[in-house]
């Protein structure tokens, strides 16, 4: 038997080249203006008309079908059970490594989905707000593992998602500041009955150990209806991270309020060495141990090349 045929037969994903995926756009209209691209794009990420047309419009079309099917199934179940539950929002998870461009993908999806007809309410949160405050991380010796699963207040995040799925409103999420690198005290983002909620974070597809007694232990992805994993080779991610670090050294790090202000006066050589050290000590370990192993759990995998362009799309078979 041809090994390639065997691998394809048992592959849980259908894999598309960029050209093949672009053809699935069909007649989905472009609803974004060119001037919006720079506002949606993260630092050094790629987002232009071609990327939206060839990657995100087909994805928007697919998601519209998934959301419609989920709504019909929900109403069928409600009719079968003879109950009148509150309407549940459709939740989309966006996962991937640091510096891969999760925020760009999440913002583009929010912008496109908001423009569907009729206009749904689409909210976006990041799991950064559910990190433990720095004081807690320092007390527990976890500052060097910030972003690892153990650095998140998982019970709080699960309670938040449970309330969202149950239709409770409004539901509050803590606010995180990338400037201070910490939770902002007494500030909240309110999520009030969205039709669609996008949840973005490095570890949103993470699972925990299964209990031996068989009791149900919820994980974040249990609340997702659809999930996207943004993928790239480790060497590429490392290069993007170093490039972003150098750019921040020249911009945000100069703010006296910045947690990383101490890096603002580093030379190019010093900044590069510092970025590589941080990558290898923290981000690479998190990628290899906690993030990359969750990739097979995604509904859709977007694989990027060295120029940030999405090269292949893998869609999980039904």
UniProtKB/Swiss-Prot annotation:
Places the protein is found: Cytoplasm
Pathway noted in the entry: Cofactor biosynthesis; coenzyme A biosynthesis; CoA from (R)-pantothenate: step 1/5
Family matches, as InterPro entries: P-loop_NTPase (IPR027417), PanK (IPR004566), PRK/URK (IPR006083)
SUPFAM superfamilies linked: P-loop containing nucleoside triphosphate hydrolases
First-tier enzyme category under EC: transferase
GO molecular function: ATP binding; pantothenate kinase activity
Domain of life: Bacteria
Alphabetical keyword list: ATP-binding, Coenzyme A biosynthesis, Cytoplasm, Kinase, Nucleotide-binding, Transferase
Principal location class: cytoplasm
Known EC number: 2.7.1.33
GO cellular component: cytoplasm
Record-stated family: Belongs to the prokaryotic pantothenate kinase family.
Name of the protein in question: Pantothenate kinase
Organism the protein comes from: Bradyrhizobium sp. (strain ORS 278)
Highest classification ranks of the organism: Bacteria, Pseudomonadati, Pseudomonadota, Alphaproteobacteria, Hyphomicrobiales
């Amino acid at each position: 038997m041809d090994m390639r045929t065997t691998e394809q037969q048992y592959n849980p994903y259908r894999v598309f080249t960029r050209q093949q995926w672009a053809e699935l756009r069909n007649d989905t209209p472009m609803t974004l203006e060119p001037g919006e691209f720079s506002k949606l794009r993260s630092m050094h990420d790629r987002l232009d008309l071609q990327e939206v047309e060839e990657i995100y419009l087909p994805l928007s079309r697919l998601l519209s079908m998934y959301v419609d099917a989920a709504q019909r199934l929900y109403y069928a179940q409600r009719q079968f059970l003879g109950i009148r539950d509150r309407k549940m929002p459709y939740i989309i998870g966006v996962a991937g490594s640091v510096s891969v461009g999760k925020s760009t993908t999440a913002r583009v999806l929010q912008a496109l989905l908001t423009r569907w007809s009729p206009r749904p309410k689409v909210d976006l949160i990041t799991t950064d707000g559910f990190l433990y405050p720095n004081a807690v991380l320092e007390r527990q010796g976890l500052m060097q593992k910030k972003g690892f699963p153990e650095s998140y207040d998982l019970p709080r995040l699960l309670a938040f998602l449970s309330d969202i799925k149950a239709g409770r409103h409004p539901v509050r999420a803590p606010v995180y500041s990338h400037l201070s690198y910490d939770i902002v005290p007494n500030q909240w983002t309110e999520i009030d009955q969205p039709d669609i909620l996008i949840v973005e974070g490095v570890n949103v597809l993470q699972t925990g150990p299964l209990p031996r007694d068989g009791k149900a232990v919820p994980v974040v992805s249990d609340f997702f209806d659809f999930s996207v994993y943004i993928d790239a080779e480790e060497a590429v991610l490392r290069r993007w991270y170093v490039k972003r670090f150098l750019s921040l050294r020249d911009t945000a790090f100069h703010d006296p309020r910045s947690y990383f202000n101490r890096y603002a006066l580093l030379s190019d050589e010093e900044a590069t060495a510092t970025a590589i050290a941080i990558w290898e000590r923290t981000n690479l370990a998190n990628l290899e141990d906690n993030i990359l192993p969750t990739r097979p759990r995604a509904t859709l995998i977007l694989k990027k090349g060295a120029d940030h362009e999405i090269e292949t799309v893998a869609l999980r078979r039904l």
